């Protein structure tokens, strides 16, 4: 669908316009692949996805644990994009931490001398990016099979299905604040993640460490550009993707974040459980209501696909309807309800930004810890 009503991000709108082309032009980037595959040893397989297989391994000379993501045959452009984004996120020098509710920009440093010839930092070099973004260590290609692989830091992750139900109220606030810091950082770098979900948030609970991983669907944000809506996993897709509105922005990540948060707070996994993309939108409308949905469609002049023509009318469901004896220790306060309500909005322009969310009263205990 061709967008009839244009929309642009409320924050970090022209970041990539202010950069040199080398920063975001991944199609013309030259990748300097290493062929030193003997530096690493694969120990066991830990996961697989549509575009890759993931293994745990070790760097032989230092015995440092690593993760090796072996890429399946895909378009070279997609591989270049992921590597360019990861190296951009790793190479930027992050200023000293400032509190998110201050008026100054959380991250303001700009770097214009990005090299077109990409080689990520290796183990003995300092990492300049944000701590909560997974660290890319190396890019290698087997000299015989030509299979490309990305080498990342290892995170002693606890599966979210096991971890999330055990987290205390304060721990949920802490980890979600850490995730917002990662999102605000990548957005400030002109990058949308486009696949925020529990599976892509690694948490080392013992060391209270969080990493946002899997940047294979991430993309640089440019004003007035229309993007592919076949991104994000079904349960975390924003309404804009489900109605084929292509001029979306960073706020897509905040919808996904909001669904994660609602799932953790209400102990309902996933929060919107559609059986197809069509049903996913119906599940959202059943909660947020038909009235606001129709206002959203009208504002952006969106015509629904034919399969939605016979959609029933639904009254908006109050958030307190999701509170029960099993979750009221997490959900039973107005602040968390207000935060979720301001994230899960049809209209992407109305959603809180990552920085705004960090300044929400629900995160006050976390901000107070930072001040100390």
From Swiss-Prot:
- The record's active-site residues are 195 (proton acceptor)
Group of enzyme by EC: transferase
> Which key words tag this protein in UniProt?
ATP-binding, Kinase, Nucleotide-binding, Serine/threonine-protein kinase, Transferase
Any Gene Ontology CC annotation? protein kinase CK2 complex
* Molecular function GO terms recorded: ATP binding; protein kinase activity; protein serine kinase activity; protein serine/threonine kinase activity
Q: Is Magnesium tagged as a keyword?
A: no
Write down the chemical reaction(s) this protein catalyses.
Answer: L-seryl-[protein] + ATP = O-phospho-L-seryl-[protein] + ADP + H(+); L-threonyl-[protein] + ATP = O-phospho-L-threonyl-[protein] + ADP + H(+)
Q: Does the keyword Kinase apply?
A: yes
Instruction: Provide the E.C. number(s) assigned to this enzyme.
Output: 2.7.11.1
Sequence ranges assigned to domain Protein kinase in this UniProt record = 40-363
Summarize where ATP binds, as residue positions.
46-54, 69
Q: Which GO terms describe its biological process?
A: DNA damage response; donor selection; maturation of SSU-rRNA; nucleolar large rRNA transcription by RNA polymerase I; regulation of cell cycle; regulation of ribosomal protein gene transcription by RNA polymerase II; regulation of transcription by RNA polymerase I; regulation of transcription by RNA polymerase III
Q: Which InterPro entries does this chain map to? A: CK2_alpha, Kinase-like_dom_sf, Prot_kinase_dom, Protein_kinase_ATP_BS, Ser/Thr_kinase_AS
Q: Which cysteines form disulfides?
A: none
Q: Subunit structure, per the record?
A: Tetramer composed of an alpha chain, an alpha', one beta chain and one beta' chain. Interacts with FACT subunits POB3 and SPT16. Interacts with YTA7.
Q: Which family does this protein fall into?
A: Belongs to the protein kinase superfamily. Ser/Thr protein kinase family. CK2 subfamily.
| Further remark | Present with 7180 molecules/cell in log phase SD medium.
Instruction: Say what the protein does.
Output: Catalytic subunit of a constitutively active serine/threonine-protein kinase complex that phosphorylates a large number of substrates containing acidic residues C-terminal to the phosphorylated serine or threonine. Phosphorylates YTA7 during S-phase to promote transcription of histones.
Q: What is this protein called?
A: Casein kinase II subunit alpha
């Amino acid at each position: 669908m061709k967008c009839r009503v244009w929309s642009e991000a409320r924050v970090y709108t022209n970041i990539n316009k202010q950069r040199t082309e080398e920063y975001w032009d991944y199609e013309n980037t030259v990748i300097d692949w290493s062929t030193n595959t003997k530096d690493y040893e694969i120990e066991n397989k830990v996961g697989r996805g549509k575009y890759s297989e993931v293994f745990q391994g070790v760097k032989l000379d230092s015995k440092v644990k690593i993760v090796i993501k072996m890429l399946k045959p895909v378009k070279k452009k997609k591989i270049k994009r992921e590597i360019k984004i990861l190296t951009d996120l790793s190479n930027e020098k992050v200023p000293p931490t400032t509190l998110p509710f201050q008026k100054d920009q959380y991250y303001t440093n700009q770097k214009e001398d990005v090299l077109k010839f990409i080689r990520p930092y290796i183990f003995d070099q300092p990492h300049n990016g944000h701590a909560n973004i997974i660290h890319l260590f190396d890019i290698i290609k087997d000299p015989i099979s030509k299979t490309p692989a990305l080498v990342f830091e290892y995170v002693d992750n606890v599966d979210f299905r096991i971890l999330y139900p055990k987290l205390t109220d304060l721990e949920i606030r802490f980890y979600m604040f850490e995730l917002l810091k990662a999102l605000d950082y990548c957005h400030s770098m002109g990058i949308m993640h486009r696949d925020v979900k529990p599976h892509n948030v690694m948490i080392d609970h013992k060391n209270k460490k969080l990493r946002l991983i899997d940047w294979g669907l991430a993309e640089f944000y440019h004003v007035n550009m229309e993007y592919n809506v076949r991104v994000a996993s079904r349960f975390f897709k924003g309404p804009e993707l489900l109605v084929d509105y292509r001029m979306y922005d960073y706020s897509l990540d905040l919808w996904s974040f909001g669904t994660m948060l609602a799932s953790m707070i209400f102990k309902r996994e996933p929060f919107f459980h559609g059986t197809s993309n069509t049903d996913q939108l119906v599940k959202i409308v059943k909660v947020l209501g038909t009235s606001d949905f129709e206002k959203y469609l009208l504002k952006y002049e969106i015509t629904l696909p034919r399969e939605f023509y016979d959609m029933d009318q639904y009254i908006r469901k109050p958030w307190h309807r999701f509170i029960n004896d099993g979750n009221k220790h997490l959900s039973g306060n107005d602040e968390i309800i207000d935060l979720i309500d301001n994230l899960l909005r049809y209209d992407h322009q109305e959603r809180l930004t990552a920085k705004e969310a960090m300044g929400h009263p629900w995160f006050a205990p976390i901000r107070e810890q930072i001040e100390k």
